[in-house]
Amino acid sequence: MSGEITARLPPPLDDAVVRRFRDAMPDALRDGPRPDLLDGLAGASPYLRGLMLADPDFAAEAFVANPQSVLDRIIAGLRMVADGTCQTDFMAALRTAKAKAALLIAIADTGGRWPLAEVTAALTRFADASLQAAVDWLLREAHAAGRLV
């Protein structure tokens, strides 16, 4: 199946960007199991390239780990951070979780690890969990401030 997926990947849009990206990557990611997918994502999507550069250890994990397990862990982390954190910390944690989920789902989708139905379900699950964590945080804050009893 990997050959079929590789055949469907678009070539990187900018080889110079891909070379600079690969030079900046740690060995674990640069020499990982899917250099074709890594190059395709880095060369075609500045957003995904930026996410991989920002957290190369997570990116390396996203290429090899079970995507469902990683998504479960991201969502569980959202639930935990909504408990007792200040607004700034909660917002930062939510942005970090969004970035990780976006990268993970993109890799699972373009790498052929998830069919469209699973990609859509993962996006929906993450959106639901993010919204629930935000509502929980807001309700706790309102209660703590005496605006909600």
Predicted regions mapped to residue ranges:
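Non-catalytic regulatory/linker segments of enzymes
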Residues: M1-V149
